[in-house]
Amino acid sequence: MCNTNMSVSTDGAVSTSQMPASEQETLVRPKPLLLKLLKSVGAQKDTYTMKEVIFYLGQYIMTKRLYDEKQQHIVYCSNDLLGDLFGVPSFSVKEHRKIYTMIYRNLVVVNQHEPSDSGTSVSENRCHLEGGSDQKDPVQELQEEKPSSSDLVSRPSTSSRRRTISETEEHSDELPGERQRKRHKSDSISLSFDESLALCVIREICCERSSSSESTGTPSNPDLDAGVSEHSGDWLDQDSVSDQFSVEFEVESLDSEDYSLSEEGQELSDEDDEVYRVTVYQAGESDTDSFEEDPEISLADYWKCTSCNEMNPPLPPHCNRCWALRENWLPEDKGKDKGKMPEKAKVENSTQVEEGFDVPDCKRTTVNDSRESCAEENDDKITQASQSQESEDYSQPSTSNSIIHSSQEDVKEFEREETQDKEEIVEPSFPHNAIEPCVICQGRPKNGCIVHGKTGHLMACFTCAKKLKKRNKPCPVCRQPIQMIVLTYFP
């Protein structure tokens, strides 16, 4: 059997214990139309307490199924006795003040326990029963003296101001310690509605649809307990988060104080303390990668700056102190060497021509033979010298012809070399660079192409390039993130 209870909150989160104790125990006599409605759901008396009136109203709405299936806080009573009683076609149980007034219009106070600190009288209550709008609602007065919303949720029995002096004195001993504990807790935040009036709210309507709601422990008697979370399971599933009546949580802050020594008797469980594990990563001062902590780079790999004698790690091309470019960091351009080669060849050829080499002249050899014969024959020195001079004079036109012929052959050779150089320029230039060793290890050839996007750089071996990729290092040349490493083969 599904147990239904009438509550004070919008979603069944707070019971009628928030009502003043004097009003809960006040005997009221329903008017004939309301009495007829109550007796239709099992009421047998003529006078009831406020708890019983709320309970039977909830039973009536449950029995007649006047609530909306989707939005269960809306009650439709246009063609029902409840609509004639309240004078409205529909209402929401969240309209506190409106429903409070409609209920009290149909009640007459029979007996009332008047507490010593109560400022209301019987005539004042009768004005509320008559529906006077100029008077302030008694529960609205309670709202002005509520300590805080967090105290209302944690201690609903202390929210009423209609207590006897003896009851307030009994609870006054408990308040300082509990308030002190609340004061030491850090930034207690409570989300609640503006007013918590004595309203009738249906709780656990959905328990008719599933038998799982029996485990919530709803009491079968009409007395409403002060439990908050036991009866709101089904309503929390149906309503949105914004419809929940009260949610309390704590936010830790640096200014929160520790618990005082007077609270030694109030031991806190492990659930009260929450430990968060935070890992803090300290970033470097610069965006550049540090090679000082790399175990695979030894001091032998460092290079010395020629300007300031500073020892620098192998990868950065510039000195860390004077920002001078490292020597031999980039290979020399082939175009410059090719442009200089013809000039050097011309100079060498001109020197060769002047020295007399590569001149195919048979007379020059005869002159040398005659000189050797002159050294052997001492008698004919003068005659041999004159003959040698004459032979040199006769050989001048032949040597000039040979020089012209050799210069034409040199020009043809230079043209052939230039055509070969042009063909080499058309071919890719990286095979020549790949012959050089790896920039990092200086031992293996450059066969690991560092690819990033549609471009790549060939400046390291495959092993060193894979290490850079594995350590999430950027490209040493352009500082772009490395996408992949390609092992490069050359013919």
Curated annotation (Swiss-Prot):
A zinc finger (RING-type) spans 438-479. Residues 242-331 are annotated as: Region II. CDD domains: MDM2, mRING-HC-C2H2C4_MDM2. A motif (Nuclear localization signal) lies at residues 179-185. A motif (Nucleolar localization signal) lies at residues 466-473. Residues 26-109 form the SWIB/MDM2 domain. Residues 170-306 are annotated as: Interaction with MTBP. Residues 210-304 are annotated as: ARF-binding. Phosphorylation on Ser-166 by SGK1 activates ubiquitination of p53/TP53. Phosphorylated at multiple sites near the RING domain by ATM upon DNA damage; this promotes its ubiquitination and degradation, preventing p53/TP53 degradation. Residues 1-25, 114-188, 211-237, 252-272, 332-418 are annotated as: Disordered. A motif (Nuclear export signal) lies at residues 190-202. Residues 125-148, 164-179, 332-347, 360-374, 407-418 have a biased composition (Basic and acidic residues). Its EC number is 2.3.2.27. Region I is sufficient for binding p53 and inhibiting its G1 arrest and apoptosis functions. It also binds p73 and E2F1. Region II contains most of a central acidic region required for interaction with ribosomal protein L5 and a putative C4-type zinc finger. The RING finger domain which coordinates two molecules of zinc interacts specifically with RNA whether or not zinc is present and mediates the heterooligomerization with MDM4. It is also essential for its ubiquitin ligase E3 activity toward p53 and itself. Interacts with p53/TP53, TP73/p73, RBL5 and RP11. Binds specifically to RNA. Can interact with RB1, E1A-associated protein EP300 and the E2F1 transcription factor. Forms a ternary complex with p53/TP53 and WWOX. Interacts with CDKN2AIP, RFWD3, USP7, PYHIN1 and RBBP6. Interacts with ARRB1 and ARRB2. Interacts with PSMA3. Found in a trimeric complex with MDM2, MDM4 and USP2. Interacts with USP2 (via N-terminus and C-terminus). Interacts with MDM4. Part of a complex with MDM2, DAXX, RASSF1 and USP7. Part of a complex with DAXX, MDM2 and USP7. Interacts directly with DAXX and USP7. This is E3 ubiquitin-protein ligase Mdm2. The lineage of its organism: Eukaryota, Metazoa, Chordata, Craniata, Vertebrata. The gene is MDM2.
